[in-house]
Structures are given as C-alpha cells and as structure tokens.
Regions:
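Conserved AMP-binding/adenylation subdomain of ANL enzymes
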Residues: 1-11, 15-58, 71-72
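Gly/Ser/Thr-rich phosphate-binding loop
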Residues: 5-6, 30-33, 56-61, 70-133, ...
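Thr-Gly-centered strand-to-loop micro-motif
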Residues: 11-13, 37-38, 89-91, 113, ...
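Alpha-helix N-cap/helix-start capping motif
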Residues: 15, 41, 63-64, 93, ...
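Generic structural signal for helix capping and beta-alpha/helix-loop junctions
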Residues: 19, 45, 68, 97, ...
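Membrane-embedded alpha-helices of multi-pass transport/permease systems
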Residues: 22, 63-66
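Short Gly/Pro-enriched turn/cap motifs at secondary-structure boundaries
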Residues: 135-142
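Conserved beta-loop-beta connector loops within the AMP-binding
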Residues: 148-168
Length: 168
C-alpha cells in the first residue's frame, strides 16, 4: 500500500472480518497512519463524500463495493474531487477488468487487486504501486512468496495425479 505517515487510510471491511481487523485496524496502527473506521452500511453518495471530505489517500475496498459504486453511476462519483487519493486496492474476490478501468476513468486511478486468505495471515499476491496494473490480474507474488498453480490431471488408464506448475 506504500503507506506514508501523512496518509489517511480507509479499509471498508467490517472490523468483525479478518480484513477489517488486519488491514482496517492493525495495519494502519503499525504504519502510524490516520485511519477511517466507518460503522454505517454501504451508501454510494456517503462513501464518495467520505473519500473527498476526509481526504482519504489510500483506499482498500471490496470488488462488490466497487461494482455497487459503478452501478450508482459515474456522475455521482464526479460530483466530488479526490485530490488526496493516490492508491486504490481491492480484496475479497476477483476484480473484473471493467472495474479497473472504471477506477481509472472515474477516480483517476486504476484499482489494484490482491489475494490472500485468513490462513495466510497477510497479502501473498498483489498489484503493488510498483507494478502497472493488468486488468483481470491480481498481480505478482510479493517478495519471499513462491506461488504455484496446482492442477489435478487425469489421463485415460492412469491414476489421477497432481501437477505443480511453477513457470509459464
């Protein structure tokens, strides 16, 4: 997320979920940044107002929320300006390419996807600020992470086997 001391961070995940706890509360505290915790339900006009008025610089949200904002219309987003916003990321499910381009068009920034799960304890694969975003891709393994594709194969007359694909 390239958090900086002057950042204003907003993770829209509920603190009752691991993303909300890990990245909504613990991560900004460890990074020493100001964090917005919003207890209200999703409301597109209010979310845009919060992004603008709270001068959010790094925003972490879910693809479902992004698609709901898309459905609410670009004109609603364009009713505000977001001069502080410098990085937008999503997590929780695959981010469709249209959402990445919507972010670039409406917010002026592409949306960076990433992947992790409760069992990993943190982000494993990401489109970091250092990478150009390829819509439809969640990014690359972070330093120190080896990621593989595991394929279950069955051939006629042979027992099933698992194949690990570690190179393109």
């Amino acid at each position: 997320f390239d958090m900086r001391p002057e950042d204003r961070w907003w993770c829209t995940a509920d603190p009752g979920w691991v993303t909300g706890t890990s990245y909504g509360i613990v991560a900004p505290l460890l990074a020493g940044v100001t964090s917005l915790v919003d207890r209200e339900e999703f409301d597109a006009p209010r979310w845009y107002q919060l992004l603008a008025e709270e001068r959010i610089s790094v925003w972490y949200t879910a693809p479902t929320a992004i698609r709901m904002l898309m459905k609410a219309g670009a004109e609603l987003a364009r009713a505000h300006e977001y001069p502080a916003l410098r990085f937008v990321a999503s997590v929780g499910e695959p981010l469709n390419p249209e959402a990445v381009w919507w972010g670039k068009d409406v917010l002026g920034l592409p949306i960076h996807d990433n992947w992790w799960q409760t069992e990993t304890g943190g982000i494993m694969i990401a489109n970091t600020p250092a990478f150009d975003v390829k819509p439809g891709s969640m990014g690359r393994p972070l330093p120190g992470i080896d990621a593989f594709i595991v394929a279950h194969e069955e051939a006629d007359g042979e027992p099933p086997r698992v194949r690990v694909i570690d190179a393109p």
